Amino acid sequence: MSHNPDAIAPHGGQLVNRIATPEQREEFLSKADFLPRVQLDDRAVSDVEMIAIGAFSPLTGFMSQEDYDRTVTEMRLANGLVWSIPITLSVTEEVASPLQEGGLIRLDNSRGEFIAVLQLTQKYNYDKTREAINVYRTDDVKHPGVQVLYSQGTVHLAGDIWLLQREPHPQFPTYQIDPSASRQLFKDKGWKTIVGFQTRNPIHRAHEYIQKCALEIVDGLFLHPLVGATKEDDIAADVRMRCYEILLEHYYPLDRVTLAINPAAMRYAGPREAIFHALVRKNYGCTHFIVGRDHAGVGDYYGTYDAQYIFDEFAPGELGIVPMKFEHAFYCTRTKQMATSKTSPSRPEERIHLSGTKVREMLRRGELPPPEFSRPEVAAELARAMRIEVPV
C-alpha cells in the first residue's frame, strides 16, 4: 500500500494530542476531590481545548516563562520556532500562592465541571504593559485584547495539560472537525493544496470574491469561522453558521469546500494574530492562508495591510504555510462586479467598499444589506435574526 502523506507537516513537526486516555481519565477522576482547583474563564477553556486537539501544536500546555518571554519580545518559542501569541493561564496571587510546582491542578470550567488537569511546572509574574505594547501594539484599555489582559491575574501557571474528554460541541457537533480529522478529510478528498480562511463575520461579497480567487489556484477551501469568545457586538455564532451554510449551498462548489468551526477565542491582536491564525490552520492541514485587509484587527489600531507586512519578517520555511495576500475588494459599479484596484479601472466614487463592520452597522440600524454587500439569501437570514422586516 502506498503511503499518502499529509499535504503539510504540523508546526514543529508533530501533531500534539493532549486528550487523556480512558485510563488516564479514570486516574485523574479518582484524584478529583484531592486536587487544588483553578476555575477557567471561557477563553482559557477554549485554549485548553485547542492545545489538547493539536491546533496549537507544538504547545503541550500553558507557556513557561522562557517561551512566554521570547514570544512577547521576538515572536518565537524558546527553541526558536515561530510563535506570535502568548498562550498562558493567568491567576491572582491569592490563587497561585498555595499551588505547589510539580503538583497536579484540577481545571474547572465556569460551571464548576472538572474538564482538565495541569501539571504545574512553573509559577511566574509578568509585565502586562510590556505584553500589551508588544503583542497588541497599544496599551489602550479600550482595545478588547488589552482590556482582557489588564483584567486578568498577575501570575502565570505553566505546564502540560490533559483534557479529560473531548465533548461534542453543544451547538455545532457536525462541524467540529479537529486537526487530525481535517488532515484525513483533505487526504480523502485528494487535496494537495488547501487554503484556510479565518472569519468572525458573516461572509460578505468581498470575502466571497477573495475566497474564489484563491480557489482558482488551490484544490480546496477550508472555511474556518471562529466560534470561541468574541466581542459583544460581533454577530452570534449560530447566525453566522446559518449564513455560511446558505452561502455554500447556493454559491460555492460543495466538493471544493469544507466548513468547520474554530473553537478558539479571538484576541484582536491584528498582525500578530494573523501569523497565529496561519500557524493554527497549518496544524489543521492547510498549505495556504488568506490574509485580507486589517486581519484580526479592531478599530483603528492597525494599518490596513500591517497583517500582510508582518509575514515578510519571516523566511517562508519558518512559517511553513503560504500567505495569500489580497487587497481590499469592493463592488465596482462601472463593471458591475467585485474587483480590487488591481483589476478595476473605476474611479473612487464608483467603488462600494464592504466590511463586516458596515454590515453589522446596517443591521443595527434596521437596514437590509444591499446585494452589492451580501447575497440576498444571506441578507434575509441576517434580517430574520435581527428581526428586520424583509421586503417581499
UniProtKB/Swiss-Prot annotation:
Catalytic activity field: sulfate + ATP + H(+) = adenosine 5'-phosphosulfate + diphosphate
Assigned EC number: 2.7.7.4
Domain of life: Bacteria
Keywords assigned by UniProt, alphabetized: ATP-binding, Nucleotide-binding, Nucleotidyltransferase, Transferase
Pathway assigned to this chain's UniProt record: Sulfur metabolism; hydrogen sulfide biosynthesis; sulfite from sulfate: step 1/3
UniProt GO molecular function: ATP binding; sulfate adenylyltransferase (ATP) activity
Family: Belongs to the sulfate adenylyltransferase family.
Annotated protein name in UniProt: Sulfate adenylyltransferase
